[in-house]
């Protein structure tokens, strides 16, 4: 049995919705276990409350980076912060030096997904900022191939790239992930789970 981790950070719930869709896609692959965790919030509680951060999440916080070594594939989700991963996710990965030194993640699969306010708000640079970290750990990056028809959907403004699933939240965050974007996220989860199963033999 292969094990897939979906690890995310979400301020307002957009990335969390994508994370659940990715996990749903993973669950559709027989013989695969999927775990869904989030990283810790760094913003003080009072600031998060005033900013309207989503607080009703059910995913547990993953505090111990050493747990990553137990998985065959890790899919990482974070909203963009100026074209890069959010500091909460960066903080988590900055604690993985021990894993890197021991080569614990070499040969494992990795993927990424994100949200931005606008269509051109840094989706692909955020995804590649995640990819860079995964590659430094010796992981093999798996994206979303164009065998996913939703990538070329033209009937709506939609997120979704070959680098990973994405969503567009709007300037005020009011837009939630569309069905097309969720389809891409589910496809991504299924695809990386199938790849992990093949490698696990």
UniProtKB/Swiss-Prot annotation:
UniProt keywords, alphabetically: Flavoprotein, FMN, NAD, NADP, Nucleotide-binding, Oxidoreductase
Residues holding substrate: 100
Cellular component aspect of the GO annotation: membrane
Residues that hold NAD(+) according to the record: 12
Cofactor note: Binds 1 FMN per monomer.
Pfam family, one: FMN_red
Gene3D superfamilies linked to this entry: 3.40.50.360
Domain of life: Bacteria
One GO molecular-function entry: flavin adenine dinucleotide binding
Enzyme class per UniProt: oxidoreductase
EC number per UniProt: 1.6.5.2
Domain Flavodoxin-like per the UniProt entry, residue ranges: 4-192
Chain residues that bind FMN: 10-15, 80-82, 115-121, 136
Keyword Cell membrane in record: no
Catalytic activity: a quinone + NADH + H(+) = a quinol + NAD(+); a quinone + NADPH + H(+) = a quinol + NADP(+)
This protein's record includes keyword Cytoplasm: no
Named cofactor requirement(s): FMN
Family from the record: Belongs to the WrbA family.
NCBIfam families registered for this protein in UniProt: flav_wrbA, PRK03767.1
HAMAP family reported in the protein's UniProt record: NQOR
Name this polypeptide is given: NAD(P)H dehydrogenase (quinone)
Species whose genome carries this gene: Chromohalobacter salexigens (strain ATCC BAA-138 / DSM 3043 / CIP 106854 / NCIMB 13768 / 1H11)
Lineage, opening ranks: Bacteria, Pseudomonadati, Pseudomonadota, Gammaproteobacteria, Oceanospirillales
């Amino acid at each position: 049995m292969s094990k897939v981790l979906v690890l995310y950070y979400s301020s307002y719930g957009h990335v969390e919705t994508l994370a659940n869709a990715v996990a749903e896609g993973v669950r559709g692959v027989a013989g695969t276990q999927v775990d869904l965790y989030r990283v810790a919030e760094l913003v003080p509680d009072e600031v998060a409350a005033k900013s309207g951060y989503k607080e009703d999440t059910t995913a547990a916080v993953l505090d111990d980076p050493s747990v990553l070594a137990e998985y065959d594939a890790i899919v990482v989700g974070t909203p963009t912060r100026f074209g890069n991963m959010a500091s909460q996710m960066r903080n988590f990965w900055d604690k993985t030096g021990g894993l890197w030194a021991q080569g614990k993640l070499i040969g494992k699969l990795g993927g990424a997904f994100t949200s931005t306010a606008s269509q051109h708000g840094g989706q692909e640079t955020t995804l590649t900022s995640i990819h860079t970290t995964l590659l430094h750990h010796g992981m093999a990056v798996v994206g979303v191939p164009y065998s996913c028809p939703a990538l070329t959907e033209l009937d709506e403004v939609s997120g979704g790239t070959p680098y990973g699933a994405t969503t567009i939240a709007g300037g005020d965050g009011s837009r939630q992930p569309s069905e097309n974007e969720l389809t891409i996220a589910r496809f991504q989860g299924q695809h990386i789970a199938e790849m992990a199963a093949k490698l696990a033999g």
